[in-house]
């Protein structure tokens, strides 16, 4: 005969054993269902040197615009093109349509990064540069500053570089952050400081992103140009995953983001860069339908709208690398290979961004997608 007290205790214990995992399951479900409090960023670069009217930008589909580029002149920053002021004014006018829009200006880029190492090298030069950044920002009414230093500690387009760039880059960002916050207290606002970063391991090795990110609002990772204008062989220039067909030690968006996370950057500060252009190689060897094959030319930039026009000729065969999650085109008649981004890749990348808890997406560059096919897909996918 079972003791009633023992029987009651057994039943109570059984109920608890049943309810405890149910409680945690419900708690986990609740956690997963918690809505994202901060909207995803959609950041578009607008190049001042392109023949494009910034007033045509659809600001309703963007959270941020980065106007490119300001140059480094005599230790400070300055716009060099005669058309810059007019174009900047038109961008600022977009805030009447989208009051929450943030407009930043970007310093440097591939051509104008030659002086970064010098201005970052000394305490006095960092202070001078930071003050100049704030002055130019205030002059035109920008909401912040974006640095596109290509690249700290490495050779690029005739740029100066030195071993101390790694530490000096972080010091420069800290100085700019101080200057922006000082001005922000006066204006009762928060001014943004962001950077564009390289996607390869070499960039990680020559910077200290774990420390640098402490001074930054977010980081735009340039997840493109994995095969570019120096390569005399074809390849995916913006693939999300590594390709099982890879021959030349290429890169991928997944690997680029993983490197940044490992370097100490929080996922919500990482913004994935997406190209609104392709890379084209000519006189390509036809083996394997031209993927990862030698070419007589390097990978030149082709705007997305131009690729769409090329397809109308009927000479291009659409190809897809399932392992890399990347599209490419092969023109057997003219031996032309094009690596390009399509709405399919946009969807896959926005899914990846959400899965990883990242901050959003960035793209280069607005004028390269005239009919906004890629932008519309990006906006719909992120929302």
Feature-to-residue mapping (PLM):
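Glycan-binding loop/region signatures in secreted carbohydrate-active enzymes
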Residues: 91, 107, 227-230, 236-238, ...
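Substrate-binding surface in catalytic domains of secreted glycosidases
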Residues: 74-86, 152-309
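C-terminal motif of bacterial Sec signal peptides marking the signal peptidase cleavage site
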Residues: 24-25
């Amino acid at each position: 005969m079972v003791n009633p007290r023992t029987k009651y205790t057994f039943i109570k214990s059984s109920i608890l054993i049943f309810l405890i995992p149910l409680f945690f399951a419900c708690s986990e479900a609740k956690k997963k269902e918690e809505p994202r409090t901060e909207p995803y960023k959609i950041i578009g670069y607008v190049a001042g040197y392109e023949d494009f009217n910034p007033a045509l930008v659809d600001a309703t589909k963007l959270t941020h615009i980065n106007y490119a580029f300001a140059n480094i002149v005599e230790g400070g920053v300055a716009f060099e093109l005669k058309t810059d002021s007019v174009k900047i004014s038109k961008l600022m006018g977009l805030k009447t349509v989208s009051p929450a829009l943030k407009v930043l200006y970007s310093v440097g880029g591939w051509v104008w990064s030659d002086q970064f190492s010098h201005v970052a090298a000394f305490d006095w030069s960092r202070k001078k540069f930071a003050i100049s950044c704030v002055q130019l920002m205030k002059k035109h009414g920008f909401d912040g500053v974006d640095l596109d230093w290509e690249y700290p500690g490495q050779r690029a387009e005739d740029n100066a570089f030195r071993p101390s760039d790694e530490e000096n880059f972080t010091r420069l960002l800290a100085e700019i952050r101080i200057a922006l916050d000082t001005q922000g207290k006066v204006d009762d606002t928060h001014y943004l400081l962001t950077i564009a970063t390289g996607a390869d391991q070499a960039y990680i090795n020559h910077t200290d992103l774990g420390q640098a990110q402490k001074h930054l609002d977010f980081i735009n990772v340039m997840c493109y140009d994995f095969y570019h204008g120096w390569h005399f062989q074809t390849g995916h220039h913006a693939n999300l995953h590594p390709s099982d067909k890879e021959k030349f030690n290429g890169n991928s968006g997944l690997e680029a983001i993983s490197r940044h996370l490992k370097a100490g950057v929080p996922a919500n500060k990482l913004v994935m860069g997406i190209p609104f252009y392709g890379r084209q190689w000519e006189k390509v060897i036809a083996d394997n339908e031209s993927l990862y094959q030698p070419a007589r030319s390097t990978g030149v930039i082709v705007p997305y709208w131009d690729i769409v026009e090329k397809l109308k000729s009927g000479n291009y065969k659409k190809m897809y690398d399932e392992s890399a999650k990347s599209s490419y085109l092969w023109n057997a008649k003219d031996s032309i290979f094009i690596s390009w981004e399509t709405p399919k890749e946009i969807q896959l990348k926005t899914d990846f961004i959400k899965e990883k808890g990242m901050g959003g997406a960035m793209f280069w560059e607005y004028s390269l997608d005239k009919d906004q096919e890629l932008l519309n897909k990006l906006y719909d996918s992120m929302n």
